[in-house]
């Protein structure tokens, strides 16, 4: 189904909107919901698109239009058969008597034989979906007029040509007859018997009129009291089996028009001649063969119940009916191309009541591609097929919970969600997650959410998830966890860590992942994730990425809401929780120090003869003072002996060991640099004075240098600086 992007979007949206309406009604617990309305809406959507494409005037849309029309027919078939199969058929047992009319016996058979009734339903469906050409303009208004005028026919008796071989029918009469009978045949296949009768009357074809009047079995409300309230007068004809054989004998008359013979074959429950059958399609061929099954089984039942007199059995007719499976196989062999169409394969499975197995086969096809067993197949190459099968699985599970394997339904829905993601139809995705179990729902939703960055799209996702009553909190938690898991390998360095001042896409992906918790107002979880994010960034030298996160989010507000949420949820006060807030505060101080460091670097790079030296010196002194204070306090309390047994102690100590030496050495370098640029020697002395801080046994900062492997580098730096002071 090749469609423009507009059409594709509309159809995806139409199907998802239908499911959304169902869920809304279900969640609101309104009046009893008819799940079959979903199928009816699907049929309507497919039918409307078929009509739109057909009316578009674009020849390239012809195939797409036919495919959508075929899909509309499919949903119609699903509706008809599933309604019947799931109906409460606890009907009163009909008691029959030998004197009842044969029509009542037929009614009893259809009531008891569910398989036969379903064949009748399929035939009704085929009739309703049979295309009948427009009424031909040259349908004759009288019989044999040209032959009588030319003298080739000596009698106006309509059956005279059959009884007298010497008559010569005019060629034009034969042509008009062919047009008429072909039209009548199409009307009969479409179930338009009344219309066919009217056409026969208008064309003066009394024989066809009389024959069509014998279609119905005899019913008499006088003796058939069981259905007396359904009829006022008798209907149908007696000795219907005799009528059937008489009509059948006419179908064997080689001298008749092929379509006239085909009419008689169909009415008698036989297969039409090859001259007509060669022009049949999958649907009409199926119709003809199902008609044969129906008529054969009905007469067999009547024979078993002694409702057919021996005087009616003037000709032998087939008494063995094919099975529906055999019929479908035969039709498939005659129409291989049509029968291989994926939608017709689904139609056949609906008729055979084997939809769950077909759904499972579709899943196997998906897995074959994933495993690499197949490069492609219909379910992958034809997205419309995935859409149909997915929605079919959803409908079946709604109507008959458990009728579709949970794993099959899940794989179809999650694959379809991936298709929607490729189409950029994010708003349509959450509704499908509602039909998954909670575990699969979390995985499917988190898979999608973890890839979203646009603020408006993210906001809409949360709104929709909440509106559909999905487990929003767990979905957002799983999304954040998924992003942490996905990026873990990127933050497992094998070489020496260096402080970097760039922000890459992976950093942003992790930031977006944590922000789901903030946007979802899950502040307790958000604080825990901010801790995890900060540690991951800092342990890998991604200090600028942490700065980016803190610039994007109001950390103070998050911490306040964190405290309020704990109170509201009656979460007991925990020493570790207080430690988390303190840890975040420490990271804020670090980021502030990094900003000052970068600002000083910028000031130095812009230094010129026009620079305000006093202001610059003041700025350096402020930077030096703040950095010195940060060096002395950064994570000191959280890595004190009081927390030595804490599970987080080693992590925090490692972060401190990475950044404290970095800050101290960079401050040292900047003071030395400033001393040279500004010609102020005392800055060198200030830099060298840091050695006492490093060697101080109270602060034990030298241990941080040892731990980070920076001690030798620092001592070399001090030695070089010392030569400058001499």
UniProtKB/Swiss-Prot annotation:
GO terms for biological process: double-strand break repair; mRNA export from nucleus; mRNA export from nucleus in response to heat stress; nuclear pore localization; nucleocytoplasmic transport; positive regulation of DNA-templated transcription; positive regulation of transcription by RNA polymerase II; post-transcriptional tethering of RNA polymerase II gene DNA at nuclear periphery. Residues 563-583 form a coiled coil. InterPro entries: Nup84/Nup107. It is found in: Nucleus, Nuclear pore complex; Nucleus membrane. GO terms for cellular component: chromosome, telomeric region; nuclear envelope; nuclear membrane; nuclear pore; nuclear pore outer ring. It comes from the Eukaryota. Gene3D superfamilies: 1.10.3450.20, 1.20.190.50. It holds the Pfam family Nup84_Nup100. It is a peripheral membrane protein. Disulfide bonds: none annotated. One of its GO terms (molecular function) is structural constituent of nuclear pore. Keywords: Coiled coil, Membrane, mRNA transport, Nuclear pore complex, Nucleus, Protein transport, Translocation, Transport. Belongs to the Nup84/Nup107 nucleoporin family. Present with 8580 molecules/cell in log phase SD medium. Functions as a component of the nuclear pore complex (NPC). NPC components, collectively referred to as nucleoporins (NUPs), can play the role of both NPC structural components and of docking or interaction partners for transiently associated nuclear transport factors. NUP84 is involved in nuclear poly(A)+ RNA export, in NPC assembly and distribution, as well as in nuclear envelope organization. Component of the nuclear pore complex (NPC). NPC constitutes the exclusive means of nucleocytoplasmic transport. NPCs allow the passive diffusion of ions and small molecules and the active, nuclear transport receptor-mediated bidirectional transport of macromolecules such as proteins, RNAs, ribonucleoparticles (RNPs), and ribosomal subunits across the nuclear envelope. Due to its 8-fold rotational symmetry, all subunits are present with 8 copies or multiples thereof. This is Nucleoporin NUP84. It comes from Saccharomyces cerevisiae (strain ATCC 204508 / S288c).
């Amino acid at each position: 189904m090749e469609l423009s992007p507009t059409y594709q979007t509309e159809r995806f949206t139409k199907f998802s909107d239908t499911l959304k309406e169902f869920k809304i009604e279900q969640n609101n617990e309104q009046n009893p919901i008819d799940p079959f309305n979903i199928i009816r809406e699907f049929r309507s959507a497919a039918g409307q698109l078929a009509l739109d494409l057909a009316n578009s005037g674009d020849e390239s849309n012809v195939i797409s239009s036919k495919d959508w029309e075929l899909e509309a027919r499919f949903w119609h078939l699903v509706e008809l058969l599933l309604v019947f199969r799931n109906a409460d058929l606890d009907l009163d047992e009909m008691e029959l008597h030998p004197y009842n009319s044969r029509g009542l016996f037929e009614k009893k058979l259809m009531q008891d034989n569910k398989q036969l009734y379903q064949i009748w339903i399929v035939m009704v469906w085929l009739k309703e979906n049979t295309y009948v050409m427009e009424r031909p303009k040259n349908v004759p208004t009288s019989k044999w007029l040209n032959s009588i005028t030319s003298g080739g026919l000596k009698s106006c008796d309509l059956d005279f040509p059959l009884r007298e071989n010497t008559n010569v029918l005019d060629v034009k009469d034969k042509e008009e007859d062919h047009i008429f009978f072909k039209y009548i045949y199409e009307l009969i296949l479409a179930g338009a018997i009344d219309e066919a009768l009217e056409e026969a009357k208008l064309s003066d074809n009394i024989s066809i009129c009389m024959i069509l009047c014998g279609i119905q079995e005899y019913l008499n409300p006088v003796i058939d009291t069981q259905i007396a309230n359904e009829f006022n007068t008798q209907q149908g004809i007696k000795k219907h089996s005799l009528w059937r054989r008489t009509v059948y004998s006419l179908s064997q008359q080689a001298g008749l028009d092929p379509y006239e013979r085909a009419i008689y074959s169909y009415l008698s429950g036989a297969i039409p001649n090859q001259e007509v059958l060669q022009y049949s399609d999958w649907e009409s061929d199926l119709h003809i063969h199902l008609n044969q099954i129906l008529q054969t089984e009905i007469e067999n039942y009547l024979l078993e119940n002694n409702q057919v007199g021996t005087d009616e059995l003037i000709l032998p007719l087939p008494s063995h009916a094919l099975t529906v499976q055999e019929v479908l196989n035969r039709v498939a062999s005659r129409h291989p191309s049509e029968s291989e169409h994926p939608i017709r394969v689904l139609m056949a499975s609906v008729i055979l009541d084997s939809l769950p197995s077909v759904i499972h086969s579709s899943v196997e096809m998906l897995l074959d591609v994933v495993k690499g067993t197949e490069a492609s197949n219909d379910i992958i190459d034809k997205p419309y097929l995935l859409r149909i099968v997915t929605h079919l699985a959803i409908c079946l599970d709604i109507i008959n919970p458990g009728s579709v394997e949970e794993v099959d339904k899940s794989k179809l829905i999650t694959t379809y969600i991936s298709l929607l993601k490729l189409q950029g139809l994010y708003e349509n995705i959450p509704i499908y997650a509602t039909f998954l179990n909670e575990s699969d729902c979390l995985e499917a939703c988190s898979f999608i959410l973890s890839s979203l960055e646009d603020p408006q799209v993210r906001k809409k996702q949360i709104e929709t998830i909440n509106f559909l009553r999905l487990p929003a909190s767990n979905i957002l938690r799983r999304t954040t966890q998924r992003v942490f898991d996905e990026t873990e390998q990127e933050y497992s360095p094998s070489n020496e860590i260096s402080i970097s001042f760039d922000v890459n896409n992976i950093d942003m992906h992790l930031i977006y992942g944590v922000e789901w918790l903030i946007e979802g107002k899950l502040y307790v979880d958000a604080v825990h994730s901010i801790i995890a994010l900060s540690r991951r960034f800092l342990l890998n030298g991604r200090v600028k990425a942490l700065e980016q996160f803190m610039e994007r989010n109001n950390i103070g507000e998050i911490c306040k809401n964190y405290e309020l949420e704990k109170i509201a949820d009656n979460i007991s006060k925990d020493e570790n929780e207080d430690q988390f807030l303190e840890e975040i505060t420490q990271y804020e101080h670090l980021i502030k120090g990094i900003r000052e460091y970068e600002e000083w670097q910028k000031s130095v790079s812009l230094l010129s003869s026009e620079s305000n030296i006093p202001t610059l010196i003041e700025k350096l002194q402020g930077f030096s003072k703040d950095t010195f204070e940060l060096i002395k306090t950064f994570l000191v309390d959280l890595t004190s002996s009081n927390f030595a047994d804490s599970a987080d102690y080693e992590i925090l100590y490692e972060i401190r060991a990475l950044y404290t030496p970095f800050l101290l050495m960079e401050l040292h370098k900047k003071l030395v640099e400033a001393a040279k640029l500004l010609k102020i020697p005392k800055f060198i002395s200030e830099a060298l004075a840091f050695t006492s801080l490093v060697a101080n046994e109270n602060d034990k900062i030298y241990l941080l240098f040892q731990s980070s492997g920076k001690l030798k580098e620092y001592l070399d730096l001090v030695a070089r600086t010392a030569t400058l002071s001499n």
